[in-house]
């Protein structure tokens, strides 16, 4: 034990950086059947072929904005872990209140 307590904050914070896998084109991981299932849940019967790429684009923009706001809340609280409450507050800020995850 280094005597710094829980969290490891303090001296020696800037260690070696880990290699991060370069992420590209992960939006294609949202498959055609997955989009189809979401549409079915929303009551859609028939789906045009052009919908899939459009849906991926819209979903990407939505997630980027929610994640950006969530990370902002996390950084302000001087944490490194994004909590469910950070996401709830980010959604609330965008006018999409979510119940059932605290607060």
From Swiss-Prot:
GO MF annotation list:
DNA binding; protein heterodimerization activity; structural constituent of chromatin
Its taxonomic path starts at: Eukaryota, Fungi, Dikarya, Basidiomycota, Ustilaginomycotina
Q: Name one Pfam family in it.
A: CENP-T_C
Modifications the protein undergoes after translation, according to the UniProt entry = Glutarylation at Lys-92 (H4K91glu) destabilizes nucleosomes by promoting dissociation of the H2A-H2B dimers from nucleosomes.
Q: Does the keyword Nucleus apply?
A: yes
This protein's assembly is summarised as: The nucleosome is a histone octamer containing two molecules each of H2A, H2B, H3 and H4 assembled in one H3-H4 heterotetramer and two H2A-H2B heterodimers. The octamer wraps approximately 147 bp of DNA.
Question: According to its UniProt entry, what is the function of this protein?
Answer: Core component of nucleosome. Nucleosomes wrap and compact DNA into chromatin, limiting DNA accessibility to the cellular machineries which require DNA as a template. Histones thereby play a central role in transcription regulation, DNA repair, DNA replication and chromosomal stability. DNA accessibility is regulated via a complex set of post-translational modifications of histones, also called histone code, and nucleosome remodeling.
Residues with the N6-acetyl-N6-methyllysine modification: 6, 13
Name the protein family. Belongs to the histone H4 family.
Q: What is this protein called?
A: Histone H4
What is the protein's major site of localization?
Answer: nucleus
């Amino acid at each position: 034990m280094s005597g710094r307590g829980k969290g490891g904050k303090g001296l020696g914070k800037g260690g070696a950086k880990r290699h991060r896998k370069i992420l590209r084109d992960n939006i294609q991981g949202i498959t055609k059947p997955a989009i189809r299932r979401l549409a079915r849940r929303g009551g859609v019967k028939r789906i045009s072929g052009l919908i899939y790429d459009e849906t991926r684009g819209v979903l990407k923009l939505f997630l980027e904005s929610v994640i950006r706001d969530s990370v902002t809340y996390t950084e302000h609280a001087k944490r490194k872990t994004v909590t469910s409450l950070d996401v709830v507050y980010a959604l609330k800020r965008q006018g999409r209140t979510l119940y059932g995850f605290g607060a």
